[in-house]
A protein has these predicted regions:
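Membrane-interface interhelical linkers
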Residues: 22-49, 150, 161-189, 199-209, ...
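Hydrophobic/small/kink-forming positions within alpha-helical transmembrane segments
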Residues: 26, 51-59, 81-86, 111, ...
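Juxtamembrane helix-entry segments on the extracytoplasmic side of multipass membrane proteins
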Residues: 7, 15, 39-43, 111, ...
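Helix-helix packing/entry segments at the starts of transmembrane helices
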Residues: 73-79, 146-161, 198-230
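Transmembrane alpha-helical segments that form core, pore/gating elements
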Residues: 2-3, 10-11, 25, 120-179, ...
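Hydrophobic transmembrane alpha-helices of multi-pass small-molecule transport proteins
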Residues: 99-116, 239-258
Length: 265
């Protein structure tokens, strides 16, 4: 998407990516007959919350991605497992001990190191990236709260449809940019990746152990560092690497403590 933003409008790119993602999701949803099911008010409310959170996440994360180095955005996003732990304690009544609270505070210190508020290296879009983490947390918690009988494909389709409609409305009054073959290839790649990631992410959050699933998020930081250097010549500085290390270390420690507590029950 970062490459795509160099050629076409922000919301046009989001619209086309979501539009390409819709047909395969619709086919899967129709085959599973998941769109004909009736859902409880609770599940309808959670799905709506998830759609709104996903729209907000898409806009904030991709805005930060457009204007910030790839590694910086990804490093800030690594605070998500810590944010989920904090949200679970505050809103779901999950018991979090002082060690995990300490890990959360240290992890967000790493975020502040990357953001560098008030310093010369401060980028205001870092705050936009941080907002995406908050919205991602809302999305993940709402996903986790959905009843197990709600089909994953229905959640994925409704979310993608919501983003498509939102992006289409955002394009009203703007000039449509001609899309060349290279951009179409990027759109197809992005749509394929986000479709698979959406489905797997929903399944993982609903059926997997969060302490097992969350560490896999940290592997994206390695990929982001490599892609940033390869495609954009973005070499992360020492401060960014330090902040990223603190976030990842704190996240693993928090998940380690969660595993110990789960094993003792």
């Amino acid at each position: 998407m970062k490459l795509l933003f160099l050629d076409i409008d922000f919301f046009q790119a989001i619209f086309l990516r979501s539009l390409v993602s819709l047909p395969p999701l619709l086919i899967l949803a129709l085959r599973a007959k998941s769109l004909l099911q009736k859902y409880s008010k609770k599940n309808k409310r959670l799905i709506i919350i998830r759609i709104l959170a996903e729209i907000g996440t898409t806009v904030t994360f991709l805005t930060a991605l457009k204007y910030m180095p790839l590694a910086n955005v990804t490093a800030i996003a690594q605070s998500l497992p810590l944010a989920i732990t904090m949200a679970a304690a505050l809103f779901l009544g999950e018991r979090v001990g002082w060690r995990r609270w300490s890990a959360i505070l240290i992890g967000f210190t790493g975020v502040l190191i990357i953001i560098r508020p008030g310093l010369a290296g401060f980028n205001s879009y870092s705050l936009v990236a941080l907002a995406s983490v908050i919205l991602l947390t809302i999305r993940e918690i709402s996903t986790r709260k959905l009843d197990s009988e709600i089909p994953t494909i229905a959640v994925a389709f409704s979310t993608t449809l919501g983003i498509t409609v939102f992006a289409a409305l955002s394009l009203i009054g703007s000039e449509w940019v001609e899309v060349h073959i290279t951009s179409w290839l990027l759109i197809i790649v992005a749509a394929s990746a986000v479709t698979v990631a959406t489905l797997l992410g929903i399944v993982a959050m609903r059926t997997g152990d969060i302490s097992f699933v969350s560490p896999f998020r940290y592997t994206s930081l390695i990929g982001a560092l490599g892609l940033g250097v390869l495609f954009f010549g973005e070499w992360p500085d020492g401060v960014t690497l330090l902040g990223a290390f603190i976030i990842v270390f704190s996240g693993f420690y928090s998940l380690h403590r969660e595993h110990i507590l789960s094993a003792s029950k």
